Amino acid sequence: YTLEEVVARNYLIQERPDAILNIIDGTNLERNLYLTTQLVELGIPVVVAINMMDIVRKNGDQIRIDQLAKELGCKVVEISALKGTGIDEAAKEAMQAAESKIPMVPQHKFCGCVEHAIAHIEEACLHDRPEAQQRWYAIKIFERDDKVLEQLNIPDRKSTRLNSSHAEL
């Protein structure tokens, strides 16, 4: 991880902002949505603002905003920073998300065996974490994220058990 990624992640986990306004490049949607899905897993309300929609349309492409919002489980708005359009709407939606204080419920589900492993990790070692963060931590443990494993300081016997269930997949 870069220093910027570590600082950003630590802030989101430790400070728990009221909402996240995730501005992504509409011309490179796939790469940007990976981060978006990780943000949604944090349980913090997220608003996605897709930038460069004017260029997306100019290129003859389209993004189904309603479908994307449904799949992500959060508000999605179109913006163009160059033209200054949609920015007020994005800010308004982010404020509403922050004021609602309703935690995100991730819509994305993995295949059954992975979901089972994530649930097992949550039950085995995350009961001391806030409920809204448990899924994110479980996914990171499943991914064997070194920073998270170090932060959580999971005892060796639990780590061995988790690794054996991971190996079964």
Feature locations, PLM:
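Flexible beta-alpha connector loops of hexameric P-loop NTPases
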Residues: 1-2, 53
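Acidic-residue sensor for enzyme active/binding pockets
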Residues: 4-5, 30, 41, 122, ...
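Helical mechanochemical/support elements of P-loop NTPase systems and associated helical scaffolds
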Residues: 4-7, 16, 31-35, 60-64, ...
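Conserved C-terminal guanine-recognition region of P-loop GTPase G domains, centered on the G4
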Residues: 7-75
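Canonical P-loop GTPase G-domain recognition
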Residues: 56-108
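Long, well-ordered amphipathic alpha-helical subdomains in the mid-to-C-terminal portions
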Residues: 105-161
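Single conserved hydrophobic/aromatic residue that forms the stacking wall/gate
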Residues: 162-169
